[in-house]
């Protein structure tokens, strides 16, 4: 289920806009070619990229953790209210339980994300990215429309307030960007994975631009977040990667079998409204913060991080090791 992205796409603006796409600023900014299909993908596969040779848990304990994760998925489905969106505080708590049940240690490095309308952008590696980013700030996700048809997870994704994109209908992209901008203007946070697909962490894509137009139109900050998965000793790990033809069950099992797996989110400086003149430069700057910096971080030694917050309140610092596709869950 790699939870993912709007792979924000840089659509050519040289052609005429699609019908009905002339109203909102975001719509006017996204003229598209009729025949173009946008389906970002990554060359990563479980066989070529995923290495789960680190310390492993005993099978019985891993099986218990797998059952716990599946139980939480089902419990979230059963316990969710019948009408309306699930409150963000409940989503954050539920995400925290899922991560803990999987046996992954989480560390957050950097300052708090701003309040109010905010576009969160991050590199995309795993289904764990979503609960990891919920620790930074609960947000509405941009998800590919196919997710709605997934059992349990599709229901929960829709009920969390996710914004969906139909990746087979590129004419719908301007409307998607406009809906993101509307949510941002309403003071909500929206999370996007601009690579548009999950990558193993050793290789990476590039940031597509469309979602950044929404931040420009809504005049809100962009919050880059760099995600890494490492072993407790500091070595990068691809065990959490959810790529290629990997199934969700296989990926969850690999994670629950992995011992000493650490997920890290590095919260970079927010990019203020108006700090970049257009979506191209904004996407490029965010990519520099997230993707280029990820490779640098893999060569870095230990750094100060803070533990995954258990509830509200302060976060005490502690020393921890630094850390390092399948179609994205969010388009």
Where are these regions (language model features)?
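Glycine-rich active-site/cofactor-binding loop and its immediate structural neighborhood
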Residues: 116-125, 129-136
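A transmembrane-helix-recognition feature enriched in membrane-embedded lipid enzymes
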Residues: 47-107, 155-160
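Generic beta-sheet signal
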Residues: 116-122, 162, 188-194
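Soluble, non-transmembrane catalytic domains of enzymes that act on hydrophobic metabolites at membranes
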Residues: 1-50, 105-111, 130, 165, ...
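Membrane-embedded segments
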Residues: 131-179, 188
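A cross-family acyltransferase "interaction/gating" segment
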Residues: 152-154, 201-277, 285, 297-300, ...
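Catalytic-site beta-strand/loop segments enriched in glycine and acidic/polar residues
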Residues: 183-211
């Amino acid at each position: 289920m790699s939870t993912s992205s709007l792979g924000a796409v840089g659509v050519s603006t040289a052609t005429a806009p699609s019908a009905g796409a002339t109203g909102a600023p975001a719509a006017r900014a996204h003229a598209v070619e009729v025949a173009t299909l946008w389906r970002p993908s990554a060359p990563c596969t479980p066989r070529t990229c995923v290495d789960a040779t680190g310390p492993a848990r005993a099978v019985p304990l891993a099986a218990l953790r797998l059952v716990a994760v599946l139980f939480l998925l089902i419990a979230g489905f059963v316990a969710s209210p019948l009408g309306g969106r699930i409150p963000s505080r409940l989503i954050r708590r539920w995400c925290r339980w899922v991560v803990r049940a999987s046996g992954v240690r989480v560390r957050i490095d950097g300052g708090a994300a701003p309040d109010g309308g905010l576009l969160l952008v991050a590199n995309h590696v795993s289904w764990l990215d979503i609960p990891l980013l919920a620790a930074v700030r609960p947000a509405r996700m941009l998800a590919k429309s196919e997710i709605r048809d997934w059992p349990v997870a599709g229901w929960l994704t829709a009920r969390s307030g996710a914004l969906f994109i139909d990746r087979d209908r590129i004419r719908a992209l301007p409307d998607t960007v406009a809906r993101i901008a509307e949510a941002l203007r309403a003071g909500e946070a929206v999370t996007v994975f601009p690579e548009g697909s999950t990558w193993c962490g050793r290789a990476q894509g590039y940031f597509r631009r469309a979602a950044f137009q929404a931040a420009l139109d809504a005049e809100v900050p962009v919050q880059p977040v760099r995600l890494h998965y490492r072993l407790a000793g500091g070595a990068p790990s691809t065990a959490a990667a959810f790529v290629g033809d990997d199934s969700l069950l296989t990926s969850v099992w690999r994670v629950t079998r992995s011992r000493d797996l650490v997920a890290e989110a590095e919260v970079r400086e927010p990019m203020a409204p108006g700090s970049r003149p257009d979506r191209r430069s904004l996407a490029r700057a965010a990519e520099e913060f997230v993707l280029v910096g990820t490779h640098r971080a893999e060569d870095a030694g230990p750094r100060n991080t803070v533990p995954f917050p258990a509830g509200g309140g302060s976060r005490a610092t502690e020393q921890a090791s630094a850390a390092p596709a399948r179609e994205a869950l969010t388009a």
